[in-house]
């Protein structure tokens, strides 16, 4: 491994504090908890939406979350290892066939729905 990759791995370990980052994929509905500082007050703001893209670039990894708020579409890009992100919770797994779901931008209503991925449980052998 080269020196830059080693430094990136150390920085990722420092930022995550040893905790693993929640696994999610495009199509999943997630709730991103963001630390917001307003003057001297600090609070946590939740942003819930569908992950339409994920960019895996080590320390520079990011993802885009899209939601419909009051009839208006809102997209927000988050850095995966940002200290402003308090947590990521997966609400629902989506079953999609694409890595980038940019086509959802031109769709609304029922045509913008994503099927839910059903996880099969293994049967116990008796």
Curated annotation (Swiss-Prot):
Record's GO cellular component terms: cytosolic large ribosomal subunit
UniProt KW keywords: Ribonucleoprotein, Ribosomal protein
A Gene Ontology biological process term: translation
Gene3D superfamilies noted in UniProt: 2.30.30.790
One Pfam family hit: Ribosomal_L19
InterPro entries in the cross-refs: Ribosomal_bL19, Ribosomal_bL19_CS, Ribosomal_bL19_sf, Translation_prot_SH3-like_sf
A Gene Ontology molecular function term of the record: structural constituent of ribosome
NCBIfam families: rplS_bact
Role played: This protein is located at the 30S-50S ribosomal subunit interface and may play a role in the structure and function of the aminoacyl-tRNA binding site.
HAMAP family: Ribosomal_bL19 (MF_00402)
UniProt similarity note: Belongs to the bacterial ribosomal protein bL19 family.
Protein known as: Large ribosomal subunit protein bL19
Gene: rplS
